[in-house]
């Protein structure tokens, strides 16, 4: 299975350059003639409308007509006056790549470009021309949202850190307010609540709301659109707010702590059903859901680590992905008042925490496929749809470039990875510990699943050096013990973080051999990209604070 596992949802790139000419209503002058027996005078009554729908009257709006307009002219103007004016987008899609900043989507783009480029060279590191044989790099293959009409950057700091968490940054995006890391839609004292854009659209404009995530639906980012808690870890209370929100569509990962931290409370799924939600746990039942079901919660059938959706690299082709949940969400939510849909690619963040570049790229591409569903929908509603793609923060300190590869990258090496670090832990490390498997036998699986070889041709870019083999052996020996990350010394933490020593060393070495590296197991302070397409897209050009994402959406949607 290639790392770049696509869902055949991408259109030709030309479809993505969707600069559309919009028909803007100009001022219409309505005239009536009052004839006098001796002298004639014309009276006018004018109405004007501008592109921002802020109508004003002035002398310049008044037009004096000395002759009666023809019947044809009056009819044409009357018809024009009946044309409905689009004042705000009817359909809004907000895609958030958790942990996705410039390095994540650029790495995915570069990787696709490398796979598609027959001249992409895996030569010895060199900045000269001698080893290139005339080959010329074609460059990255841009992800669909990288071709959007508008592109901006958002600063992500919160009230306590330049390297913030998902709770505070999602709060900024959803409400336009800063707060401390770990807090969801409340101020720094934990006493003042902030109303979210989704809540306002639901209440003020009767728009339907959808919330999708590849991780838990009561995790920090999705929770930021409906919950208000001083701690992001209050999963049960957040789950209760999910039900109380009355939002029409939730889909993706499962709920954490469904019976509370002590497993002594009423099941959240039962509470949801009592509140009128239809809850599904199988793909077959999810496929049967229609708009008539009104309020639904679709839990992915193939939940993996921590009851989240599988990593994209581990997903079978017949299993639903984020794009499928977006597609079903459109079916459920579409109505005359429109809808707002937030879709989170949450496992980008989890993969970056674990320093797994292969899984990171795969889940970034899964988010891109989900975006394509919205793009296809927007082609049917070009003047009514706004699509936004952004991140909440950067995770892992991912960088394209590594000291050991100098000025070169070997990104196609990543195609050798077949499974995520998480699946390797679950399906292989557990077996090794149970059976007392030797290091040499374990390395046979590593070669099959990650391409790293202990023996082979010296020109093979995935052939391990003696130094790398010793790193892997030391990590394996530690992983076979009852190790505890809490007892790590500083050197061990830098090498392994809180992850299985063997699996994280495997991904570190594969990353480095590909010309990729990470600097952290946590978040960083990089700005995130903001890409916009459709109604009001130009508002999102520029460099601004992440609270402005909310402010710009609120302005376009005319909410208080």
What are these regions (language model features)?
Residues 1-17:
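Short, Lys/Arg-enriched N-terminal segments with co-localized hydrophobic residues
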Residues 17-28:
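Bacterial N-terminal signal peptides that target proteins for export
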Residues 29-37:
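Bacterial N-terminal signal peptides
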Residues 37-55:
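Sec-dependent signal peptide cleavage junction
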Residues 55-76:
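Extracellular mucin-like PTS domains
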Residues 86-91, 100-105, 109-171, 219-560:
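A post-motif C-terminal structural segment
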Residues 177-240:
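Extracytoplasmic mature domains of secreted/periplasmic and thylakoid-lumen proteins
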């Amino acid at each position: 299975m290639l790392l770049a596992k696509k869902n055949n949802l991408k259109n030709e790139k030309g479809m993505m350059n969707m600069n559309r000419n919009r028909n803007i209503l100009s001022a219409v002058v309505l005239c009536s003639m009052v004839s006098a027996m001796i002298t004639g005078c014309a009276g006018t009554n004018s109405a004007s409308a501008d592109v921002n729908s802020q109508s004003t009257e002035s002398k310049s709006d008044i037009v004096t007509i000395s002759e009666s307009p023809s019947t044809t002219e009056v009819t044409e103007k009357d018809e024009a006056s009946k044309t409905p004016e689009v004042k705000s987008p009817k359909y809004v899609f907000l895609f958030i790549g958790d942990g996705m900043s410039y390095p994540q989507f650029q790495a995915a783009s570069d990787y696709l470009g490398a796979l598609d480029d027959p001249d992409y060279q895996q030569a010895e590191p060199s900045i000269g021309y001698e080893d290139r044989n005339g080959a010329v790099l074609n460059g990255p293959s841009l992800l669909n949202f990288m071709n959007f009409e508008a592109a901006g950057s958002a600063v992500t700091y919160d009230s306590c850190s330049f390297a913030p968490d998902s709770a505070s940054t999602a709060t900024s995006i959803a409400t336009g307010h800063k707060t401390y890391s770990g807090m969801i839609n409340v101020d720094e004292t934990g006493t003042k609540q902030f109303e979210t854009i989704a809540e306002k659209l639901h209440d003020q404009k009767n728009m339907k709301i959808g919330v999708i995530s590849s991780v838990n639906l009561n995790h920090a980012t999705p929770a930021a659109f409906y919950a208000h808690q001083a701690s992001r870890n209050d999963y049960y209370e957040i789950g209760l707010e999910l039900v109380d929100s009355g939002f029409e569509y939730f889909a993706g990962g499962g709920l954490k702590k469904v019976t509370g931290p002590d497993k002594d409370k009423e099941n959240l799924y039962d509470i949801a059903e009592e509140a009128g939600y239809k809850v599904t746990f199988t793909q077959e039942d999810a496929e049967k859901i229609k708009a008539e079901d009104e309020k639904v919660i679709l839990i992915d059938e193939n939940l993996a680590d921590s009851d989240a959706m599988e990593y994209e690299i581990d997903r079978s082709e017949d299993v639903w992905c984020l794009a499928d949940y977006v597609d079903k969400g459109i079916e459920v939510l579409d109505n005359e008042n429109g809808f707002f849909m937030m879709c989170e690619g949450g496992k980008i963040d989890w993969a970056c925490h674990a320093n797994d570049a292969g899984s990171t790229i795969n889940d970034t591409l899964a988010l891109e496929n989900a975006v394509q569903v919205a793009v296809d929908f927007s082609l049917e509603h070009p003047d009514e749809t706004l699509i936004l793609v952004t991140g909440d923060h950067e995770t892992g300190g991912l960088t394209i470039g590594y000291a050991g590869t100098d000025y070169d990258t070997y990104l196609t090496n990543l195609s050798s990875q077949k499974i995520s670090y998480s699946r390797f832990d679950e399906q292989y490390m557990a077996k090794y510990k149970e059976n007392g498997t030797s290091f040499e036998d374990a390395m046979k699986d590593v070669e099959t699943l990650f391409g790293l070889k202990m023996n082979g041709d010296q020109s093979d870019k995935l052939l391990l050096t003696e130094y790398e083999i010793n790193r892997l052996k030391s990590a394996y020996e530690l992983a076979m013990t009852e190790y505890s990350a809490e007892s790590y010394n500083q050197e061990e933490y830098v090498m392994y973080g809180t992850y299985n020593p063997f699996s994280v060393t495997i991904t570190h070495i594969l990353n480095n051999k590909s010309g990729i590296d990470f600097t952290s197991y946590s978040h960083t302070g990089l700005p995130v990209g903001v890409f916009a397409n459709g109604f009001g897209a130009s508002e999102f050009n520029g460099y601004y604070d992440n609270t402005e994402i909310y402010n710009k959406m609120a302005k376009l949607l005319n909410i208080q």
